[in-house]
Amino acid sequence: MWKNPNFFIHLPFKKTEDVNPIKASHREMNPNHLALAKQELSTLLSEGLIEPTTSPWACEAFYVNKHAEQVRGKLRLVIKYQDLSHFLAVDKFPLPNKSALFQHLSNAKVFSKFDLKAGFWQLGIHLEERYKAVFCIPDHHYQWTIMPFGRKNAPSQFQKAMVTLFQPLLTNALIYVDDILLFSKDEESHEKLLIEFYNLVKSHGIMLSEKKMVMDSLL
């Protein structure tokens, strides 16, 4: 889906403030972190998820030695977007209230739960906007082609895309960012709902996390 221009996101600046591009002067990385970053970014480059840039913007990327910042026991590259976020306009698309969502389930008996794999990465960034989604490590400067984690407005923009994409199913689907819950009154109607869901997933090239799927759970 990230290559579908119909779902490319924009990163508009505030109209009420002068925008001064900020280019981080990167502090030194220790040799182990730098080697790890180069390896990780080489993979992202080969997959087309980032690309070299000459943007006037640059946000510092670094590793944090905290358990909360680790992914499956491995260090996670963190990007400091605060300077860029200051200039970005707020996306006002509302995120649903989690407790209010469950009010729609009073008559539901059958459920299936899905989670999008690497959720935000499934949305591309408009070609003319990529120069804003930029980060650097020592001697390297890149821009994202997809929506990165941790960026301002990412949850709202992703919610908007998912609601638009799954609009035909919303009477029997709850969507909270990259989590989708399908619900039906009986197994027969749920089977039809799943067929519609998978057709949309396939037609838009959406990737689901198999590990987090919960299928045909009965109440």
Locate predicted features.
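Cytochrome P450 core scaffold surrounding the K-helix E-X-X-R motif
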Residues: S85-K92, F120-K132
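Catalytic palm active-site di-aspartate
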Residues: D115, G150, L170-K185, K212-L219
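Conserved catalytic palm subdomain of right-hand nucleotidyl-transferase polymerases, strongest
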Residues: Q70-H86, L101-Q122
